[in-house]
Amino acid sequence: MLKLNLQFFASKKGVSSTKNGRDSESKRLGAKRADGQFVTGGSILFRQRGTKIYAGENVGRGGDDTLFAKIDGVVKFERKGRDKKQVSVYAVAE
């Protein structure tokens, strides 16, 4: 009697793959100047997505919602009502 010993091997090598190993670069959002700090006009005060903090006196809002100083002065973070915050820049009396 004839016995056949058949063994089947993989025709392709098993290649490992992963769904990990990627991450987006941080966007460096948040406060760039502190309360009471002196700033010049055009200085970035706060980088954000959406309006987490609103623009107050002498503060402009850029296309990406970045808040910047319009004049030279002192930064002041304030409450705007019960649940909102704003940042203003006040001129310093010389």
UniProtKB/Swiss-Prot annotation:
One GO cellular component, as annotated: cytosolic large ribosomal subunit
Pfam families given in the database record: Ribosomal_L27 (PF01016)
Annotated region described as Disordered, given as residue ranges: 12-32
Keywords: Ribonucleoprotein, Ribosomal protein
Single Gene Ontology MF annotation: structural constituent of ribosome
One example of a Gene Ontology biological process annotation: translation
Tagged with keyword Repeat: no
Alphabetized PANTHER family for the sequence: LARGE RIBOSOMAL SUBUNIT PROTEIN BL27M, RIBOSOMAL PROTEIN L27
Recorded family membership: Belongs to the bacterial ribosomal protein bL27 family.
Protein name: Large ribosomal subunit protein bL27
Source organism of this protein record: Staphylococcus carnosus (strain TM300)
Classification of source organism: Bacteria, Bacillati, Bacillota, Bacilli, Bacillales
Gene that encodes the chain: rpmA
